[in-house]
Amino acid sequence: MSETYVSEKSPGVMASGAELIRAADIQTAQARISSVIAPTPLQYCPRLSEETGAEIYLKREDLQDVRSYKIRGALNSGAQLTQEQRDAGIVAASAGNHAQGVAYVCKSLGVQGRIYVPVQTPKQKRDRIMVHGGEFVSLVVTGNNFDEASAAAHEDAERTGATLIEPFDARNTVIGQGTVAAEILSQLTSMGKSADHVMVPVGGGGLLAGVVSYMADMAPRTAIVGIEPAGAASMQAALHNGGPITLETVDPFVDGAAVKRVGDLNYTIVEKNQGRVHMMSATEGAVCTEMLDLYQNEGIIAEPAGALSIAGLKEMSFAPGSVVVCIISGGNNDVLRYAEIAERSLVHRGLKHYFLVNFPQKPGQLRHFLEDILGPDDDITLFEYLKRNNRETGTALVGIHLSEASGLDSLLERMEESAIDSRRLEPGTPEYEYLT
């Protein structure tokens, strides 16, 4: 892993998980929230089943009223507030989905709430928060990431006496998220099947901890696979370190899972179940590719975190006929992001490349580039050039979309043989990051 860590192991980590969550706790929560939210579908996916050789089922949490599983933990927490706590109000921090769940709870209970979200939260999610909360919710946009927004929410709760509903590191929240697993097992049982693997997206770890807790009691032979964004793999960092630590930086693209530090309780639950939990990472480019595939093939609008389970699926091999459940955790994606999503996917698949090309300042050079260097099915998607009459050459920024990823080597060979000087911009360089 390339992240730099700041060691912050909490001395109370193990103590916080001393009273681990049992299946009975989750079943009680399921009964508590079942009058408000209906079970989400568990759908067989022919395309992914054919690609993997396994039986792939999608748990459609993107079809919740708030388009995310987060309503489960928020509702389980809010339903247990005393009248005194309701009168004092609710505070929450979220990258967007938990906020919508809390907003839904505030409106349904008639409780005032203040919700803190980081500045990179998509406008679509901000708007949906207000739709669900209406006049019962005020939105506070602050901080460059979830952790900074969370710090502001904690300060608010301490100052005002409002109840803070945690997005992932609280017992009632984790128990609520665990009802996803209870539904999965019930739905599979009704089909006469049992799960061999459950693929779980991971940010702060609340969903993973809830699923692991339920499966440990009710389906101990089921393997749980947690998938984190490669740019925010905080659970893997915690397991490697022996306790939760804070990543110095995270890539905010997978906004629903861009968490610098996993929850202490969630870490404890996962650590105690390492024999049945496997952790892995998915690159942001792989996530984008799966988002597009889900939309184009199944008509599913998944947010980046919602596609993590599918991105992880593609990196694994399964015994033929294995039953694998992928949790599509959310569908709150801003349509304005799809241009960036498509770009990242093309780069990930090796179809999009950028070059700095030094054209001699004389007629016919661009025609030469197009005819002799570019492949017959390749396309120029970006061309920025400013002619300078007082120079022998002029530099152009050129983006090329290849018809096949395998065509890169021959393109580079033609560039090498050409009299026109060119340089490929490598991923990870400042120029490249600026473009993508």
Swiss-Prot record:
Chain's gene name: ilvA
Q: Which cofactor does it need?
A: pyridoxal 5'-phosphate
- Kindly report, in one word, the top-level EC class recorded for this enzyme: lyase
Signal keyword on record: no
Q: Give all cystine bridges in this chain.
A: none
What is the purpose of this protein? Catalyzes the anaerobic formation of alpha-ketobutyrate and ammonia from threonine in a two-step reaction. The first step involved a dehydration of threonine and a production of enamine intermediates (aminocrotonate), which tautomerizes to its imine form (iminobutyrate). Both intermediates are unstable and short-lived. The second step is the nonenzymatic hydrolysis of the enamine/imine intermediates to form 2-ketobutyrate and free ammonia. In the low water environment of the cell, the second step is accelerated by RidA.
Q: What are the entry keywords? A: Allosteric enzyme, Amino-acid biosynthesis, Branched-chain amino acid biosynthesis, Isoleucine biosynthesis, Lyase, Pyridoxal phosphate
Residues at which pyridoxal 5'-phosphate binds: 97, 203-207, 329
For the biological process aspect of GO, one term held by this record is: threonine catabolic process
Reactions mediated catalytically = L-threonine = 2-oxobutanoate + NH4(+)
Q: Where is this region: Regulatory?
A: 358-436
State a single Pfam family of this protein.
PALP
Q: Lineage of the source organism?
A: Bacteria, Bacillati, Actinomycetota, Actinomycetes, Mycobacteriales
- The protein's name: L-threonine dehydratase biosynthetic IlvA
Write out the pathway annotation from the protein's UniProt entry. Answer: Amino-acid biosynthesis; L-isoleucine biosynthesis; 2-oxobutanoate from L-threonine: step 1/1
Q: Tell me a Gene Ontology molecular-function term this record carries.
A: L-serine ammonia-lyase activity
The UniProt family comment states: Belongs to the serine/threonine dehydratase family.
**Segment Catalytic: which positions?**
1-357
Q: Which superkingdom heads the taxonomic lineage of this protein's source?
A: Bacteria
* Positions carrying N6-(pyridoxal phosphate)lysine: 70
Q: How does it assemble?
A: Homotetramer.
* Residue ranges constituting the ACT-like domain according to the UniProt record: 353-427
InterPro entries annotated for this entry?
Answer: IlvA (IPR011820), Ser/Thr_Dehydratase (IPR050147), Ser/Thr_deHydtase_PyrdxlP-BS (IPR000634), TD_ACT-like (IPR001721), TD_ACT-like_sf (IPR038110), TrpB-like_PALP (IPR001926), TrpB-like_PALP_sf (IPR036052)
Q: What is its EC number?
A: 4.3.1.19
